[in-house]
Each structure stands twice: as C-alpha cells, then as structure tokens.
Regions:
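Conserved nucleotide- and phosphate/pyrophosphate-binding catalytic cores
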Residues: 94, 100-239
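A short, terminal or domain-edge coil/loop segment
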Residues: 32-45, 70-81, 169-187
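Alpha-helix initiation/capping motif
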Residues: 13, 39-40, 52, 62-64, ...
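Divalent metal-coordination and catalytic microenvironments
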Residues: 7, 35, 91, 136, ...
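Internal, conserved structured core segments that host functional sites
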Residues: 57-106, 110, 131
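N-terminal Rossmann-like or analogous alpha/beta NTP/dinucleotide-binding catalytic cores
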Residues: 1-75, 194, 233-235, 239
Length: 239
C-alpha cells in the first residue's frame, strides 16, 4: 500500500497506469523459469550490478540462489508486459542490457514475440545514482540509509543533519572536498537557482557555494540546513 501511495503522490494516474502486486501474477514466476534456461551462471556473475550487490551485502562466501537470479526475474517483469521503455538509475543499466540479451535469445530460439526494451535515464546525471545518507552505497531500504518520499519533515531533517560529508573537514576554516560528499551529491540532484534566492541569498548559485566550501570558511551545518530546505520543498507536494 505504501508503495502505491508513493506512486500516486508522485503523479502516476491509476486510471492510466496499472498498479499491481508483482507476487500475485503467477505467470511472471513461470516466465522467469523459462528464462533461466537462456542465461548461464557465468553471465550472471559478469553482471556489474550483481557483483556490486554481492559485495555490498557480504554474499561472497555464500550467494542465495534467489538473489543471484533476480536479474532474470526483473527481465520477466519487463518483458511480460512488452515494455518499450524502462525508467532506471545508472546502476540498473546492466539489468536492461541483460534483459535485451534474453529477449534476443528467446526471439531467436522460439519466435519474435518479445520486445527489446530501452532504458530511460534521468536527464540530470546526479539523479542517476543517489548514494545513501551514509555515503557508502546507493539508497537501499534493506541497508536503512534512505530518505523516503513519505518521511515526515522532522525525519528528513534528522537524516540530512546526519549525512556523510567530508571526514577531513573538521573545522569551518578547513578546505572541504566535494568528491564523495553526500550533501553536495544531493544538491547536484535537487538544487535549483531559485532555492538560493529563498534560502541562501549570499550565494548566486551552486558553483559559488562549492567554491566557498572547497577553499574553506563554510561549515557542513550551514550546507546541510540549506539542503534540508531544498529537500523539504521538493518533498512537500508529494507528502
């Protein structure tokens, strides 16, 4: 229910988009088993997304079969409905490529009935892979490092104020680093010029803010408070 509410809050119209519970469509499971005969273990092991997830979840020593084969299940979810375009983050591109391979092989072996989907990436590159608030991996419900669309204003504020920044930026006067700094990654993704007019008029744009941070004299707390204002404005219509 929560996921469906998120979908509709973001603008999906249930009169135009069908929202369903994946586990209740038994044909998807059946299609997954057919696809398993078209994919080798070696190919799954080469999938960059699978390799990254295995390392992140410490599955190297013992990989659950269900986890290992989830790219095949995703291929079923996509192809069963003849999807032509799939909105994804950058880390999911290998999944789309693997789906296209399955489609090509199925159509070659059996009949040309499946559609090869294309990936639709966000235009803003920073939105293609948002890290978790801990800065260690992408946002993931299982890792507990997410900002949820339904989070209250207080929850969002608490999470932003605990965000990973630059561990070497100990004093306000210290020069800060942008690379790997989660706060600036989120600003790259969500900040707009008008946000400076409303919440941080001392700066004309994000480039000026970054320049001040890297030369020193700008504290993490001030930047986080600005990000909180940006995120609250972004999420309020969804709430």
């Amino acid at each position: 229910i929560e996921v469906a509410l998120d979908y509709m809050s973001c603008g999906l119209d249930p009169s135009k988009a069908t929202i369903f519970i994946q586990s209740q469509i038994s044909e998807l499971c059946e299609l997954t088993f057919y696809y398993m005969d078209l994919v080798t273990v070696a190919r799954l092991q080469r999938n960059p997304t699978v390799k990254s997830e295995i390392q992140m979840r410490n599955f190297e020593a013992s990989i659950p079969v269900g986890f290992f084969t989830y790219p095949i299940s995703q291929a079923s979810d996509i192809t069963a409905f003849k999807a032509t375009t799939v909105p994804v983050g950058g880390d999911q591109l290998p999944m789309i490529e693997q789906t296209r391979e399955i489609v090509h092989k199925f159509n070659t072996v059996y009949a040309p009935v499946l559609v090869e989907p294309k990936a639709l990436l966000p235009e803003n590159e920073a939105c293609q892979r948002l890290p978790g608030i801990d800065g260690k991996a992408k946002m993931s419900k299982s890792l507990g490092n997410c900002i949820y669309l339904s989070d209250s204003a207080d929850d969002v504020r608490t999470k932003i104020m605990s965000m990973y920044t630059d561990p070497e930026h100990l004093l306000v006067s210290d020069p800060g680093h942008l690379e790997g700094n989660t706060v600036f990654t989120y600003l790259d993704a969500f900040c707009k010029p008008e946000h400076f007019e409303r919440y941080l008029p001392d700066y004309a744009n994000l480039d000026e803010l970054k320049a001040h941070y890297t030369r020193g004299g700008l504290g993490d707390v001030k930047v986080k408070k600005f990000l909180n204002n940006v995120m609250q404005e972004t999420l309020e219509p969804i709430r």
